[in-house]
């Protein structure tokens, strides 16, 4: 019966004219008489519209860096409003994505037993509450870290608390762990997973990562409430997010929560991280939100760049003793380097952590020192601070970073920066005839 349908249809097409065929079969025929010039106009219009749609939705478009991002900064004098607007665009699918995102094999790296197609991550602080995970990952990142998330909701410090230093490609923030709290963020992550499981994408059951992408990872950065307990708040974080994170990050280095950086002292940090690892291990058989029967997310600790060598050595010892899986170097700095171009002393002297290009020398120095004291330990080092190019990424890798993270440069340059960094990194690696994995720690071997 099915094989006869095309034969009958073709016979009708040959024995009836077009109008008779459409009327006889209850369809409305297309209006005849579209002139050549009109048809050309329609065709050109559709072509231009399609090209414009592709161009503006593609993160590689220069429009985003040179037009859209400057416009957003212009209409949001308070940098925090710009931050919120950016997250709104990313959350609602209005931000451009990286079309044809096929990472070159030289960028592939295995971290914590899992493959990433590229080692470029989005640092914590951009998406504090996990609202825009898909919008960010679709821009080409290989990893995203949301948070910091605190056990209870808290507003953070009073506004204004986020300041741009555009001449330096830098920002100062004193957000103070503003967070929706564990329950809200867990609900957001669970809703995302539920939608994914109910969609066609999960039918082949091939996605194991909680990022919901085959070769990308999701990290959750854990913080403490302003008046919270310095140990229990982190243990609550592990309990809340063990099922939802590919990676757990213990943030003991934000300069905007009173007393937090004191947790970096060796004895205190060793005790904290030992308890965190024990809590993680006790929950392994609870599985994860995708249905895995066991789940053991690696634990990383994020530290400050404002440390002398002896302090870095003691943190390395704490990390080894507690058996965490890695260290992120680094958070923002409370220093104001003399290299700053910004002359507005009121702006430069704002309290808070400085991030962006001026942070790079401090973060890189701290990374090299940390690599020196963790060599041979198996600890994974993640570089973060002032990265804005492929050359920067290469420099951090050679200093010991298996992966790098960025945020401030992304905010200034727009979503196209990720493709640019990956392209530049690929080109530089091929010039050396090496892969990313081969250059990790090259300068400290």
UniProtKB/Swiss-Prot annotation:
Cite a single GO BP annotation: 'de novo' UMP biosynthetic process
The compartments listed are: Mitochondrion inner membrane
Q: Which reaction does it catalyse?
A: (S)-dihydroorotate + a quinone = orotate + a quinol
Transit peptide: which range? 1-16
One GO cellular-component annotation of the UniProt record comes to: mitochondrial inner membrane
User: Pfam families, per this entry?
Assistant: DHO_dh (PF01180)
The residues that the entry says bind substrate are: 128, 173-177, 251-256, 331-332
This protein's UniProt keywords: Flavoprotein, FMN, Membrane, Mitochondrion, Mitochondrion inner membrane, Oxidoreductase, Pyrimidine biosynthesis, Transit peptide, Transmembrane, Transmembrane helix
Recorded E.C. number(s)? 1.3.5.2
* PROSITE patterns for this protein: DHODEHASE_1, DHODEHASE_2
InterPro entries, sorted:
Aldolase_TIM, DHO_dehydrogenase, Dihydroorotate_DH_2, Dihydroorotate_DH_cat, Dihydroorotate_DH_CS
Q: Which residues form the active site?
A: 254
Cofactors (names):
FMN
Which EC class is this protein assigned?
Answer: oxidoreductase
Q: Which residues cross the membrane?
A: 39-56
Topology relative to the lipid bilayer, per the entry, is: Single-pass membrane protein
Give the signal peptide, or none: none
Q: Where does FMN bind?
A: 124-128, 148, 221, 251, 302, 330, 356, 386, 407-408
Q: In which pathway does it act?
A: Pyrimidine metabolism; UMP biosynthesis via de novo pathway; orotate from (S)-dihydroorotate (quinone route): step 1/1
Cofactor binding, per record = Binds 1 FMN per subunit.
Q: Which family does it belong to?
A: Belongs to the dihydroorotate dehydrogenase family. Type 2 subfamily.
What miscellaneous comment appears in this entry? K.lactis has two isoforms of DHODase, a cytoplasmic isoform and a mitochondrial isoform.
**Name of the protein in question:** Dihydroorotate dehydrogenase (quinone), mitochondrial
Instruction: Tell me what organism the protein belongs to.
Output: Kluyveromyces lactis (strain ATCC 8585 / CBS 2359 / DSM 70799 / NBRC 1267 / NRRL Y-1140 / WM37) (Yeast)
Per the UniProt record, the lineage of the source organism begins with: Eukaryota, Fungi, Dikarya, Ascomycota, Saccharomycotina
């Amino acid at each position: 019966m099915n094989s006869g349908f095309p034969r009958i249809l073709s016979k009708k097409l040959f024995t009836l004219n077009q109008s008779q065929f459409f009327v006889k079969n209850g369809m409305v025929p297309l209006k005849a008489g579209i002139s050549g010039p009109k048809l050309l106009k329609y065709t050109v219009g559709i072509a231009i519209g399609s090209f414009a749609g592709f161009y503006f939705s593609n993160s590689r478009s220069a429009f985003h860096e040179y037009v859209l991002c400057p416009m957003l900064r212009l209409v949001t004098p308070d940098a925090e409003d710009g931050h919120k607007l950016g997250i709104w665009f990313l959350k609602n699918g209005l931000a451009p994505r990286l079309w044809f995102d096929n990472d070159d094999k030289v960028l592939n790296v295995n971290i914590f037993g899992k493959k990433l197609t590229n080692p470029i991550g989005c640092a914590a602080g951009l998406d504090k509450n996990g609202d825009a995970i898909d919008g960010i990952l679709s821009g080409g990142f290989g990893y995203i870290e949301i948070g910091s998330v605190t056990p209870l909701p808290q507003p953070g410090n009073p506004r204004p608390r986020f300041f741009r230093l555009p001449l330096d490609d830098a920002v100062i923030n004193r957000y103070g762990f503003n967070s929706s709290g564990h329950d809200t963020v867990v609900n957001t992550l669970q809703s995302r997973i539920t939608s994914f499981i109910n969609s066609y994408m999960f039918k082949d059951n091939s996605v194991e990562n909680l990022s919901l992408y085959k070769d990308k990872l999701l990290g959750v950065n854990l913080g403490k409430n302003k008046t919270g307990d310095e140990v229990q708040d982190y243990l609550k974080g592990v309990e809340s997010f063990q099922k939802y994170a590919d990676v757990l990050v213990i943030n003991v280095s934000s300069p905007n929560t009173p007393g937090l950086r004191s947790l970096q002292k060796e004895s205190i940090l060793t005790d904290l991280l030992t308890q965190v690892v024990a809590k993680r291990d006790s929950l392994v058989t609870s599985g994860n939100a995708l249905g895995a029967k066991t789940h053991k997310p690696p634990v990383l600790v994020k530290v400050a760049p404002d440390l002398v060598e002896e302090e870095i050595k003691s943190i390395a010892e704490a990390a080894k003793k507690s058996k965490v899986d890695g260290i992120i170097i680094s958070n923002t700095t409370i220093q104001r380097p003399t290299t700053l171009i910004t002359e507005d002393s009121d702006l430069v002297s704002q309290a808070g952590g400085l991030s962006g290009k001026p942070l790079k020398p401090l973060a890189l120095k701290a990374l090299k020192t940390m690599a020196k004291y963790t060599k041979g330990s198996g600890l994974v080092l993640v570089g973060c601070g002032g990265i804005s190019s492929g050359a920067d990424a290469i420099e951090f890798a050679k200093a010991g970073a298996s992966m790098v993270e960025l945020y401030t440069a992304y905010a200034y340059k727009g979503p196209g920066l990720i493709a640019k960094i990956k392209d530049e990194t690929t080109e530089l690696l091929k010039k050396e005839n090496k892969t990313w994995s081969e250059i990790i720690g090259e300068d400290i071997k």
